[in-house]
């Protein structure tokens, strides 16, 4: 197998290498869902999957409650989606409602519900769903017009371009269809409000849950980004506030920060997604643009050629003129069929390729978010270990100080300190090494700071005890943050892997459908051209045959048509035609020779025999003939 070919990591498989996992109990198993792929064309799910809470038994009961599982339909839109209603964008209208400048609104229809939304509403819906579900793959929407379009066409013309509007209608409809088919996104009430008539979308954006989203998704729970603390009125509400603070104390790592113990499954997923994006964006889309460009140039040339043939048909008369006109019509029909081919090609091939290029970018963003959650977990874990080592050193120092103080009080009877056990010595060396790694790069500054604090500190015992209390508080906060990071990492890994599996099934079905549609487009193009050229062939056969070639009899033509099918008849080569002409000429020559052999030879006349009945032999031709001397050829003067 080629070394560049790697197995698909999106498929569910056991991890090839262990990864750091929080010490949490396994999640409560759920009943198998009857959900299907968004691209399979099967009926929608009969029930919605719940948004799971990954922490069933968290530390000290401190947890972030997740959204409650749905037990029924939240609105009529949800009921229609579950019943299998399809969403369509039926029209695009130009309007000036709510302002002086005109803009385009898209008419959305779902069952009996009809609503109008502009492009900015679709964009805000995509952004809102991305914030509400940071570890789910949100379908892409078409991008805005480029600055080149505005510069070339102008702002108003670019917005009202019929081609751009038609393309946006198709892509926005695909976006909505993928949303309602998603097992979790299809049950989101924000989407239902978007599809509901007489609902102000601006009010939806400024009301919960969208208004509760954190500015930084890394500081919010992955399974409930809209979680907000409440003023604790009872001891049972205090853990929720503690968890909220723990999430906001998490660090904000860079997406390129390396991991000490990466998860091999997601490393494979990142590598596969990078190849996937490079293949679609850098190879398939580029080749597809080049092919469609050449088809467009060919269609333009065929339109010019058809005009030339039609103009030539006006010069000729009779059967030849009719045949030339039919050939011109066939060329025009091929031009029209090619134009229709390009339109269908854009719908069935170009747009799906672009959608999956956008999907690759979105998946990389989701994998990057999960990577940052993993980095958060490792950073908090390392900081917690450092603080625990620091606390142990401070406590040992405190115990040693108390022992010395007790020894001094007893009159110095015990001055020698006991030797450390070998195991304790090893632990001390390991802690020293971890402290050295943690403070690497700040050695000189730490030494100076320690010396100054030792000279200035007038009460080292009180300072040491204050440091112990402060370190214990830091450890308590880090333990809460560690628990929150562990929950987020576990939920992000499980949910993202499940959505990657769903996306892989959807991708296979979509690529299969794209290949079938492309073959059907070419088949229709061939059918249209075949009919047009058949009509031209019939007109050409009505023309009289070439005078230097014997015409075929009707019996021969019928015999050839009966023995040869339509494909064989149209694929007949010039060699076959010339062979038939040579055979006919041979038959004609044999017939003439037979007729000549049957006729008697004529008797010579007296003038030819010279009166004696003997035919004189022909005289040899003189080399210096008079005509040749005068420069005349055998056909006359040169």
From Swiss-Prot:
Which keywords belong to this entry?
Answer: Autophagy, Endosome, Lipid-binding, Membrane, Protein transport, Transport
Which PROSITE patterns does UniProt cross-reference here?
A: PX
Give start-end positions of Low complexity composition bias: 1-14, 225-239, 552-562
Q: Where in the cell is it found?
A: Endosome membrane; Endomembrane system
Give any GO molecular function from the UniProt entry: phosphatidylinositol binding
Membrane topology is: Peripheral membrane protein
Q: Does the keyword Transport apply?
A: yes
Q: Which residues bind a 1,2-diacyl-sn-glycero-3-phospho-(1D-myo-inositol-3-phosphate)?
A: 118, 120, 144, 168
> Compositional bias of type Pro residues: which residue ranges?
15-30
Which InterPro entries is this protein grouped with?
AH/BAR_dom_sf (IPR027267), PX_dom (IPR001683), PX_dom_sf (IPR036871), PX_Snx41/Atg20 (IPR044106), Sorting_Nexin_Autophagy (IPR051079)
Q: Where is this region: Disordered?
A: 1-69, 215-239, 408-432, 545-638
List, alphabetically, the GO terms of the cellular component aspect.
cytosol; endosome membrane
Q: Check the record and name the SMART domains matching this protein.
A: PX
Coarse class of the protein's main subcellular location: membrane
Give the compositionally biased regions (Basic and acidic residues): 423-432, 585-601
Q: Which GO terms describe its biological process?
A: autophagy; protein transport; retrograde transport, endosome to Golgi
Superkingdom field: Eukaryota
Please give the record's comment on domains. Answer: The PX domain binds phosphatidylinositol 3-phosphate which is necessary for peripheral membrane localization to the perivacuolar punctate structures.
Tell me, what does this protein do in biology? May be required for cytoplasm to vacuole transport (Cvt) and pexophagy.
Q: Which family does it belong to?
A: Belongs to the sorting nexin family.
What name is this protein filed under?
Answer: Sorting nexin-41
The organism named in the record is Cryptococcus neoformans var. neoformans serotype D (strain B-3501A) (Filobasidiella neoformans)
Give the taxonomic lineage as stored in the record.
Eukaryota, Fungi, Dikarya, Basidiomycota, Agaricomycotina
Q: Which gene encodes it?
A: SNX41
């Amino acid at each position: 197998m080629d070394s560049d070919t790697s197995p698909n990591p999106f498929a569910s498989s056991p991890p090839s290498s262990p990864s750091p996992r929080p010490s949490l109990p396994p999640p409560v198993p759920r009943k198998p869902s009857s959900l299907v792929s968004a691209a399979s064309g099967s009926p929608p799910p009969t029930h919605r999957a719940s948004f799971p809470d990954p922490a069933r038994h968290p530390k000290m009961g401190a947890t972030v409650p997740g959204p409650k599982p749905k037990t029924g339909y939240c609105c009529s839109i949800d009921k229609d989606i579950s019943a299998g209603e399809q969403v369509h964008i039926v029209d695009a209208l130009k309007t000036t409602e709510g302002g002086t400048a005109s803009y385009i609104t898209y008419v959305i229809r779902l069952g009996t519900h009809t609503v109008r939304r502009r492009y900015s509403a679709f964009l805000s819906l995509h952004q809102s769903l991305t914030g509400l579900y940071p570890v789910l793959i949100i379908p892409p929407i078409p991008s805005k017009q480029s600055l080149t379009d505005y510069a070339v066409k102008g702002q108003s013309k670019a917005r009202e371009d019929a081609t751009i509007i038609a393309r946006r209608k198709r892509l926005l409809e695909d976006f909505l269809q993928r949303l309602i088919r998603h097992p979790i996104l299809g049950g989101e009430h924000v989407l239902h409000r978007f599809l509901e008539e007489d609902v102000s979308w601006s009010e939806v954006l400024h009301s919960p849950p969208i208004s509760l989203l954190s500015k930084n998704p890394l500081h919010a729970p992955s399974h409930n980004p809209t979680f907000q603390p409440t003023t604790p009125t009872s001891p049972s509400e205090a853990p929720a506030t503690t968890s909220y603070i723990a999430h906001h104390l998490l660090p904000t790592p860079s997406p390129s920060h390396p991991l000490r113990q990466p998860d091999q499954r997601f490393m494979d997923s990142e590598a596969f997604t990078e190849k996937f994006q490079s293949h679609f964006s850098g190879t398939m889309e580029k080749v597809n643009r080049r092919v469609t460009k050449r088809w467009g140039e060919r269609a333009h040339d065929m339109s010019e050629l058809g005009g030339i043939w039609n103009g030539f048909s006006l010069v000729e008369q009779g059967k030849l003129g009719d045949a030339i006109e039919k050939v011109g019509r066939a060329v025009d029909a091929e031009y029209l069929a090619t134009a229709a081919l390009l339109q269908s090609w854009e719908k069935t091939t170009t747009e799906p390729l672009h959608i999956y290029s956008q999907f690759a970018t979105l998946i990389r963003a989701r994998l990057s978010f999960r990577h940052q959650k993993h980095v958060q977990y490792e950073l908090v874990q390392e900081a917690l270990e450092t603080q625990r080592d620091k606390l142990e050193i401070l406590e040992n120092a405190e115990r040693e100080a108390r022992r010395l103080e007790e020894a001094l009080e007893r009159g110095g009877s015990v001055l020698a300190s006991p030797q450390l056990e070998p195991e304790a010595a090893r632990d001390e060396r390991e802690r020293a090494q971890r402290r050295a790694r943690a403070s690497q790069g700040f050695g000189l500054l730490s030494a100076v700071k320690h010396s100054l604090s030792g000279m200035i500190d007038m009460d080292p015992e009180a300072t040491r005890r204050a440091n112990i209390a402060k370190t214990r508080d830091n450890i308590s906060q880090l333990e809460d943050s560690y628990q929150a990071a562990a929950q987020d990492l576990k939920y992000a890994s499980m949910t993202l892997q499940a959505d990657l599996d769903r996306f892989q099934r959807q991708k296979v079905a979509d690529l299969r459908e794209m290949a079938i549609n492309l073959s059907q487009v070419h088949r229709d193009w061939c059918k249209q051209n075949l009919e047009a050229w058949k009509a031209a062939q019939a007109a050409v056969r009505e023309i009289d045959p070439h005078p230097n070639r014997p015409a075929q009899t009707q019996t021969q033509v019928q015999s050839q048509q009966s023995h040869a099918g339509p494909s064989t008849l149209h694929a007949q080569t010039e060699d076959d035609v010339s062979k038939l002409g040579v055979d006919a000429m041979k038959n004609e020559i044999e017939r003439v020779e037979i007729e000549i052999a049957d006729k008697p030879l004529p008797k010579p006349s007296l003038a030819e025999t010279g009166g004696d009945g003997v035919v004189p032999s022909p005289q040899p031709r003189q080399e210096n003939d008079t005509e040749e001397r005068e420069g005349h050829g055998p056909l006359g003067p040169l």
